[in-house]
């Protein structure tokens, strides 16, 4: 008979312990799983709490900043206004004293600037020199304003063209305005009776300046003078035209009268040669006298009657008419 090596009762206990061990392991595993979930939930809740804490900190910081700004504003409001006034007065003291505001309001005309220009007179302009060339020659000595050159008369121009001359414009004399009179005086003093110069083979190299400074004369004076001369010329022309018309009319009337008198005298002479003392000559002479002398007008006047004159009776007029018929 085989002997037992182990106790059955002990084996049963060990098996129970083993089963219990397995059960404990499973229970431990089951306990481990929810703990992990709890840890995740705990981590999530902690993150949310941290975010909320950060938001609360930010809100608290904003509130503190707003309070600080309000405190700063209150502090600036507390600064007395006298300091600002003192600062403004200090700035005003630094400004120049002669500074003025330029206001152009309606009803207040602005005073015009003083005219400091000067005018020179050129008694002779080189032949066929244009105003642009003259300006280019005088500009180096100062700022040039207006230029006026007198053209040659139309009659002399037509005569020159008929003689085979060039069609370019020819100017006789002129006036030049400088914006500053000191430049005009300098030009008149230093360039008068001097050669124009420039390139040696230039067209105007040997021409001579003839310049005179017009003291106390401005450009508007020249314009007024030219306008007055044009008005006087037009008035003289109108007077001459009216005088010529009246002279022509009187001449034609005298010419017609002379022809008529010559015709009458010729007819009278013919009749005298024929020995006919016709009455037609007297009639012709009367006609001539009527044409030469103005007719005399005579007016017939009615007789004066008194208010007390008696009116004729009704039957007297009829009797007078019947007596004249019988």
Swiss-Prot record:
Residues 11-20, 45-77 have a biased composition (Acidic residues). GO terms for cellular component: nucleolus. GO terms for molecular function: RNA binding. Its main location: nucleus. GO terms for biological process: endonucleolytic cleavage in 5'-ETS of tricistronic rRNA transcript (SSU-rRNA, 5.8S rRNA, LSU-rRNA); endonucleolytic cleavage in ITS1 to separate SSU-rRNA from 5.8S rRNA and LSU-rRNA from tricistronic rRNA transcript (SSU-rRNA, 5.8S rRNA, LSU-rRNA); endonucleolytic cleavage to generate mature 5'-end of SSU-rRNA from (SSU-rRNA, 5.8S rRNA, LSU-rRNA); small-subunit processome assembly. The keyword rRNA processing applies. Transmembrane segments: none annotated. It is found in: Nucleus, Nucleolus. Residues 118-208 form the RRM domain. Residues 21-30, 266-290 have a biased composition (Basic and acidic residues). Residues 1-77, 266-326 are annotated as: Disordered. CDD domains: RRM_ABT1_like. Keywords: Nucleus, Ribosome biogenesis, RNA-binding, rRNA processing. Gene3D superfamilies: 3.30.70.330. Belongs to the ESF2/ABP1 family. Involved in the small subunit (SSU) processome assembly and function, and in the 18S rRNA synthesis. Required for the early cleavages at sites A0, A1 and A2. This is Pre-rRNA-processing protein ESF2. The lineage of its organism: Eukaryota, Fungi, Dikarya, Ascomycota, Pezizomycotina.
